[in-house]
C-alpha cells in the first residue's frame, strides 16, 4: 500500500490506556480553555460522535481565522498527565505538533474527509491504535486496525474510519514535521 504504511504492530499500549482511564476528565477538556487563540467548534454547525482528548491543539491568531491555516500549537493541561504516550513518541520523533486521542463509539464512522489547510502541507500524520478494532480507508486502500498498531497515512487524500469492534475505539492521532528520517 502506498497511502497507508504500517510501521509496527503488537505495541504494548496498556500503560497508555491506563493513563487515559485514570484521567476521564481530560476528554473534551479543551472546551474549557478560555483563550482567544483557540478556535472552538460551533455546536449548532457540527454533529460530533467522536470525543477528543487533545494534548497539543491548533490555535488561531485572530477571530475568524481557520485553524488549519496556522502553525500555532498549544499544549493543553492534559499534556503533562499522559506521559506514557509521550514516551512512545520520543522513541520515533524529535518533534511532534498537534496530537489527540480520539474515541469512536461501536458501529460509528468518521466520514471520508481530507485534512485541509496550509498547516498539513508540511506534516506527516500518524495513528497509534490504543483500543478497539476499526476499518481505516485512505483513497482506495483499506486496512483493519488492531490495538497496538502504529501507522502513517496520506491525510492529503480522502480518509475515514469505521469502528467494527465491540468496544469504543481509541486511537492517538498526531502530526510530525516532514523529515526524511520519519518512519
Give a label for each model feature.
Residues 89-93, 117-120:
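Short, conserved, surface-exposed binding loops centered on an aromatic residue
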Residues 111, 127-147:
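A short beta-strand-loop-beta hairpin characteristic of the jelly-roll/cupin
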Residues 144-158:
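Conserved metal-binding segment of the jelly-roll/cupin
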Residues 94-96, 105-107, 121-125, 131:
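Short connector loops at helix/strand junctions that flank enzyme active sites
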Residues 101-120:
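Conserved short histidine dyad/triad with adjacent acidic residue
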Residues 161-165:
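Asparagine-centered strand-capping/turn motif at beta-strand->loop junctions
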Residues 124-129, 150-152, 166-183:
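A short hydrophobic beta-strand segment most commonly corresponding to one strand
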Residues 1-91:
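Non-heme Fe(II)/2-oxoglutarate
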Amino acid at each position: 500500500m502506498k497511502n497507508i504504511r504500517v510501521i509496527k504492530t503488537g505495541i504494548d499500549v496498556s500503560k497508555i490506556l491506563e493513563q487515559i482511564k485514570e484521567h476521564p476528565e481530560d476528554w473534551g477538556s479543551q472546551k474549557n480553555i478560555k483563550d482567544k487563540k483557540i478556535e472552538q467548534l460551533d455546536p449548532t454547525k457540527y454533529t460530533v460522535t467522536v470525543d477528543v482528548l487533545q494534548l497539543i491543539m491548533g490555535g488561531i491568531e485572530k477571530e475568524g481565522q481557520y485553524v488549519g491555516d496556522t502553525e500555532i500549537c498549544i499544549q493543553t493541561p492534559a499534556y503533562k498527565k499522559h506521559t506514557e504516550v509521550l514516551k512512545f513518541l520520543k522513541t520515533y520523533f524529535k518533534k511532534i505538533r498537534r496530537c489527540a486521542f480520539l474515541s469512536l463509539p461501536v458501529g460509528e464512522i468518521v466520514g471520508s474527509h481530507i485534512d485541509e489547510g496550509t498547516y498539513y502541507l508540511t506534516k506527516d500524520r500518524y495513528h497509534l491504535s490504543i483500543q478497539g478494532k476499526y476499518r481505516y480507508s485512505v483513497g482506495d486502500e483499506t486496512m483493519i486496525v488492531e490495538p497496538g498498531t502504529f501507522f502513517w497515512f496520506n491525510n492529503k487524500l480522502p480518509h475515514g474510519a469505521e469502528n467494527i469492534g465491540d468496544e469504543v475505539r481509541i486511537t492517538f492521532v498526531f502530526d510530525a514535521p516532514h523529515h526524511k528520517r520519519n518512519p
